[in-house]
Amino acid sequence: MIHNKLLIAGSIILNLVFTIHILYNNTSTWSPTWTNRAALEAEAAASVSCSGHGRSYVDGLGVLDGHKPCECHDCYTGKDCSVLLKDCPVDANSGDPLFLEPFWIRKAEESAVVESGWHRMSYTFNGYGLFMSAELEKIIRKLHNVVGNAVTDNRFIIFGAGATQLLAASVHALSQTNSLSPSRLVTSVPYYNLYKQQADFFNSTNLKFEGDASAWKRSERNDDIKQVIEIVTSPNNPDGKLKRAVLDGPNVKYIHDYAYYWPYFSPITRQADEDLSLFSLSKTTGHAGSRFGWALVKEKTVYEKMKIYISLSSMGVSRDTQLRALQLLKVVIGDGGNEIFRFGYGTLKKRWEILNKIFSMSTRFSLETIKPEYCNYFKKVREFTPSYAWVKCERPEDTDCYEIFKAAKITGRNGEMFGSDERFVRLSLIRSQDDFDQLIAMLKKFVSKEAVVVDSI
C-alpha cells in the first residue's frame, strides 16, 4: 500500500517537473523554427514594390524558377509595372473589392496566417463529422453583434464557398420537390444577374425563374402557383438601394441577400431579422478570392437541407479558407470594426464625391440618387456610398448605354443583364485606386465632349 502511494507521489512530482519545464521553455526560450522560411518567402514577395502599380505574390507566375515577378494593375506594364499604357480601356465591370487592399497592407502583421503542412488534414473538425470551425462561427456572431446589421440569436449558421454557393443551396432548400408545378423564383428589377444565370444553368424541374417580383404580383399567372421564392437584395446590386420584400402570403419564401449590408456601402438602419440571410467575406473584408460566405437560417428543416447541399457539392468549405477568414475577422472586430469600416467608408465617400461632381456637369448622363439615412453603426445621418454607379443615358438616341460607354473606352455592365433597360450601365467603384483613377480620367475626357469644363475636379 505504501509502495503504491510512493509510486503515485513520484508520478505526480515527475509530471509537475515536466509541466514546469515545458511552460518555462514555451514562455522563455521558445523561438520559431520551421516558420522562418515561410515568413521570409511571404515578406520577400510583399516587399517587391512594383512601382506601386502591381503586386508580387508567393504563388505568382515564375516563382518556381526563383523569380518574384510583378502582376501589374490594368493599364500598367513593364517589369516593375512603371509604364502606363496610353488610352487604355478601363475595366469598370468587375466587382473586385480591392479598395480595401491598402487597409490590409497596413495590417500585414495582424492579418498574416502561417499554417503547418499537417494543418487540418482531416475532412472534418475534431473528428466529429463537422465541416465548420466552431471558433469562426463564434466570431461571425460577434461581428454581426458589433455592426448591428443582423440578428444571430436563434439562428443556425452554415458556411459556403461564397454567397454564390449559398444562394444555390438556399434555392434548393426552399424549392418544392415532387410537385407538378415548379417553384417560381422572382426578385426586384434591377436585379443581380447571377440569380437568373444560376436558375437557367441548373435548369431544375423544381424551379423556374420568372424575373421581376412586382410584375409577377400583378400577373394572373400567380394564382395557381403553390410556392414562390423571392430574393430580396439589400442594399441592391446594382443600384445600392435598401430593399424590402414585394410579395406576401403563405406560399412565399424569402432569401435575403445582405452581401453589401456593411457600413462601407450603406447606413445600417436596422438589424436584419429574417428567416434566411446571406453574407459574404468578399464584401465584408474584401477577400473575394477566398470564396467564403455564410447564411443565417431560422428554420432547422431549411438549415438541414442547405447543409446536405453543401456537403454533397463540396464537403464544406476549405479548412484553410476558414482559418484565414477567422484571422481576418479577428482583425476586423478587434476595435469593434472602427478602423476598417471608417477606412472603407471614407474611401468610397471620396470616390462618390468625385463621381458626383463629374456627372453634375453632364446633361447626357445621370446617376441614381438615394436619400441619406441615419446609420446605427456610425451614430449619424450619412449618405449611401454604393459599390456601383447605376448610370442612365438620358438622350433619346442613346438607347444602348453600355455601348456608348464602351466606345469611350469604359467597360461597364449592361443594364439589360440586370433585367432593366439598356439605357442603364453599371460602373464598379470598388476596384483598386489605379482602376478608379483611370475611370475618372476617362470620364472627364468623355463628359468634356459636352463642352463642359471638368479639369478643375
Swiss-Prot record:
It is a single-pass membrane protein. Pfam families: Alliinase_C, EGF_alliinase. Pyridoxal 5'-phosphate binds at residues 123, 163-164, 237, 257-260, 280-283, 291. It comes from the Eukaryota. One of its GO terms (cellular component) is membrane. Probable aminotransferase. This is Tryptophan aminotransferase-related protein 3.
